[in-house]
């Protein structure tokens, strides 16, 4: 039986979501996206150059069959994010939107108040909202209450590659909300992706870790394996951590005893 997951009316098999920024060129991006096995690819609406057509357009290099997830990157107010989400829908990218309202240009941490404000408006307009948020369980719950279809807490600052800095809060978020939790931002390597899945994340979204790797295509394959391995480990159930050793074989009935 396939291990599927869903957001709103959309169902997926791959638990790795990928981005389109920072690649050295479009052909490399295309090969990496294909190697990742991802079904969802996020695109920054404000950074799309609509004047470019054919092979000059980023959209032309996205593998066929991938679901577009427009995002509101580079929006610093709720109003900007709302307008950008509407533009994405007008461009026929669908009702899914990765909602970003940035509060600080240096850290790219989210503006929580603006995020919740924008989420409420977009939910009322029929969008399936996936908000990029901090790792605060209280904020995650407020976003769920606002009608968001999922929450996407950061593992670390965007593009930092620091890995999951606060796995404890991520775990609390997963226990607090009923909607899917996707870890977004900060992943640096495959073990980070595996850890996110082992904690119980429904999926992981990343861009820089693949795009800026020395070999983006190989890293995409590694991230795919990391996500799949972490998911299997979560389903299998890890053994409890113990302070002292526990022998694998019985200590009684030993030869010579």
From Swiss-Prot:
The gene is thiG. It holds the Pfam family ThiG. Homotetramer. Forms heterodimers with either ThiH or ThiS. GO terms for biological process: thiamine diphosphate biosynthetic process. It comes from the Bacteria. 1-deoxy-D-xylulose 5-phosphate binds at residues 159, 185-186, 207-208. Gene3D superfamilies: Aldolase class I. The active site is at 98 (schiff-base intermediate with dxp). Its EC number is 2.8.1.10. Catalyzes the rearrangement of 1-deoxy-D-xylulose 5-phosphate (DXP) to produce the thiazole phosphate moiety of thiamine. Sulfur is provided by the thiocarboxylate moiety of the carrier protein ThiS. In vitro, sulfur can be provided by H(2)S. Keywords: Cytoplasm, Schiff base, Thiamine biosynthesis, Transferase. This is Thiazole synthase. The keyword 4Fe-4S does not apply. It is found in: Cytoplasm. It comes from Anaeromyxobacter sp. (strain K). It is an enzyme of class 2 (transferase). GO terms for cellular component: cytoplasm. Belongs to the ThiG family. It catalyses: [ThiS sulfur-carrier protein]-C-terminal-Gly-aminoethanethioate + 2-iminoacetate + 1-deoxy-D-xylulose 5-phosphate = [ThiS sulfur-carrier protein]-C-terminal Gly-Gly + 2-[(2R,5Z)-2-carboxy-4-methylthiazol-5(2H)-ylidene]ethyl phosphate + 2 H2O + H(+). One of its GO terms (molecular function) is thiazole synthase activity.
